[in-house]
Amino acid sequence: MLALLGNVIAVDDPPLAVPADIRRPDEGVVISRGTRVYLRTFTRRDLAWLTEWVDDPYLERMVGSEFLHAFKHDWDKGPGFHDAVMSDPTQVVLIVEAYRGWTKPVGVVRLFNIHMLEGYAFLETIITDPRAIRRGYGVEAGKLISYYGVDVLGVRRIEAKVYAYNVLSMNSLRRNGFHQEGVLRQAGFDGTLYWDVVVFGILKDEIEAVRKRDKVYLPLDEPEGNVIEPT
């Protein structure tokens, strides 16, 4: 999918204020930079991180990610998963990297179930490192990929679903301008109990309002540049 997007540019300069001796070399192509995190393409080497994340019971309960579920159960954590993801025209998967000395990715963010004709997609943001929680990384990653969705994919609406007990994720969505649009009663199951799933949505003009408010842009615009931050 990303290979077909000829107007995506790589940003090769290393993040500022990060000592070279503690910074992991970049992998993949940087798609978007914010003030706290940057988003890069999903590479085969990232399968090692996915292997670690899919066995985290806390992430499973808080996210219930179909992306991680498919990697573990449909592909048996195999290398073919990467090729399947990259050739899937209905999703864009990006890895979340944080500045200031982090030695591994802090999560993954994606737009999925992309409907180009109708102009809408679904958002999933997973912050996987407990040390990265409550630092605004998930909030900014969600903003950056939303801007990407508007600028590159041309979407006009983005939806997200969150378990009702994941208050932090709901607050993160609201900070990004999402509006609660409904509740799917007892649509989620955590292995023991059924839970409500809360539906959020945001429109293109609302995404643009957030961008103007926060002054965080895609490199394409300005060279300077279930959703989750678990509690």
Roles of regions detected by a PLM:
Residues 1-47, 52-55, 100-231:
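Acyl-donor (CoA/ACP) binding surface of acyl/acetyltransferases
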Residues 60-63, 93-94, 210:
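Short, hydrophobic secondary-structure boundary micro-motifs
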Residues 79-80, 96-97, 146:
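Short, well-ordered amphipathic alpha-helices
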